[in-house]
């Protein structure tokens, strides 16, 4: 089995390698290819050395190759994993600072920041998909690249690649509740409804017994993501919502508090992008230590805990045709009746070797349906804008987003973001050649 990691120089790669090494008995991996772009060559070289040490420590006969040749890396792969950041951290910082300059939330996957990241990223992922169609037509593409739902929807609509989008949020809820109730993860059953970074948990069962009231009444806590401020939830709100919101809901349900905090960080030149840049530097300093031959615990500060476990569990299920349940980003196909058939949703799915099938969700109450439909409409328009380069569609997408207060604000943010990202937007600017970075 050949596994190709696009964005192999990512700071997350040791997490992924740890997972693959741990399940080698089930997967039988013969080759791992790490591929990146010239701008990431230094990090790729560091990662190649660390990966080699990890594989040698495990005593496994896995051939490791690091390259800038994406097509060679993709050829005949069984699984392609994408974890790229088009524009590097510099453009993430630009997204945050432009958003906050205009007084709106600046976040990597939500609002104006997620919108701009999607416009930069979708064309590159579709280009990767063309290579997969040609060179590894039977491969599964596991997409971790954010905004994962938007990127996966674009691939579902505009390529023939077998794709599944993944996020580490669902598995973190399983981990949290298994710890809370002191049971194995297999004893926890969760029903998720929504789209990537906008999922609600509508059912929580522990060994078959419903325990969702524990969370809604404050008896037990829910999972709190490391990269999102923790303000807690109002219990009256939770009980009337009748569902457990995910951490990213805070940008919608607690907008004022999060925006106030972000604006203070902006004034101090210390937004999340600045924080991540410092963490990444510390991580790569660690990775260069020739005695390091395992994933350092410091990686958990990066916000990607357990993402490798989600990826490796999915690969083993696909490989073994296990028909077990995973929470994934897939084509709707009627699973959520209030969303379009071709929308990308994040729900529980049955995984077989040849397909991934979403489970029917059933009735979605209006307090969930309202926000879900609006954000999904924004996502539909954003995918269209990314593919066509239509500025009018882009303006409508950004105006529709709940975190953008007016069409005037949307236009001002859009114009500045497009200009700042000109180099990465060949579909919007005909004088720009396509980029793979």
Describe the predicted segments one by one:
Residues 182-437:
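Long, compositionally biased stretches enriched for glycine and/or charged residues
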Residues 14, 140, 144-208:
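Rossmann-fold dinucleotide-binding core
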Residues 3-35:
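N-terminal Rossmann-like dinucleotide-binding module
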Residues 53-79, 85-86, 105-112, 123-136:
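A structured beta-alpha segment of the ubiquitous adenosine-cofactor-binding alpha/beta core
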Residues 15-22, 46-55, 129, 174-178:
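Short, well-ordered amphipathic alpha-helices
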Residues 90-157:
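Rossmann-fold NAD(P)-binding glycine/threonine-rich loop
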Residues 2, 30-31, 63, 140, ...:
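Residues at the starts of beta-strands that form the adenosine-phosphate
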Residues 23-59:
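Glycine-rich phosphate-binding loop and adjoining beta1-alpha1-beta2 segment
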């Amino acid at each position: 089995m050949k596994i190709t990691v696009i964005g192999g120089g990512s700071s997350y790669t040791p997490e992924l390698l740890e997972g693959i090494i741990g399940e080698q008995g089930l997967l039988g991996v013969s080759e791992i290819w790490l591929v990146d772009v010239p701008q990431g060559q230094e990090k790729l070289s560091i990662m190649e050395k660390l990966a080699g040490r990890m594989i040698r420590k495990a005593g496994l006969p896995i051939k490791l190759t690091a390259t800038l040749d994406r097509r060679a890396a993709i050829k005949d792969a069984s699984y392609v994993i994408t974890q790229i950041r088009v524009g590097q951290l510099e453009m993430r910082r630009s997204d945050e600072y432009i958003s906050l300059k205009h007084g709106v939330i600046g976040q990597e996957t939500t609002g104006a920041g997620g919108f701009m990241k999607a416009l930069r990223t979708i064309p590159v992922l579709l280009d990767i998909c063309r290579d997969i169609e040609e060179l590894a037509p039977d491969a599964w593409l596991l997409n971790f690249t954010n905004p994962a739902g938007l990127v996966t929807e674009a691939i579902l609509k505009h390529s023939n690649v077998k794709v599944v989008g993944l996020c580490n949020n669902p598995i973190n809820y399983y981990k949290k509740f298994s710890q809370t109730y002191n049971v194995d993860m297999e004893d926890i059953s969760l029903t998720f409804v929504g789209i990537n970074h906008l999922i609600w948990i509508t059912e929580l069962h522990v060994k078959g017994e419903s325990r969702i009231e524990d969370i809604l009444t404050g008896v037990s806590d829910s999972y709190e993501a490391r990269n999102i401020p923790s303000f807690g939830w109002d219990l009256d709100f939770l009980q009337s919502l009748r569902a457990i919101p995910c951490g990213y809901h805070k940008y919608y349900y607690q907008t004022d508090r999060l925006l106030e905090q972000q604006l203070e960080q902006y004034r101090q030149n210390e937004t999340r992008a600045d924080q991540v840049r410092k963490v990444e530097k510390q991580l790569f300093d660690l990775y260069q230590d020739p005695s390091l031959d395992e994933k350092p615990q410091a990686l958990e500060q990066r916000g990607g805990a357990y993402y490798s476990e989600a990826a490796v569990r999915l690969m083993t299920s696909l490989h073994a045709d296990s028909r077990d349940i995973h929470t994934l980003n897939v084509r709707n196909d009627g699973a959520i009746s209030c969303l379009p058939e071709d929308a990308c949703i994040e729900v529980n799915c049955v995984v077989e070797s040849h397909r991934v099938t979403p489970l029917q969700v059933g009735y979605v109450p209006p307090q969930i349906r309202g926000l879900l439909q609006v954000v999904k409409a924004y996502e539909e328009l954003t995918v269209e804008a990314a593919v066509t380069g239509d500025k009018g569609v882009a303006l409508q997408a950004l105006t529709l987003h709940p975190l953008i207060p007016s069409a005037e604000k949307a236009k001002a943010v859009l114009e500045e973001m497009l200009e700042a990202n000109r180099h990465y937007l060949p579909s919007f600017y005909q004088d720009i050649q396509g980029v793979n970075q």
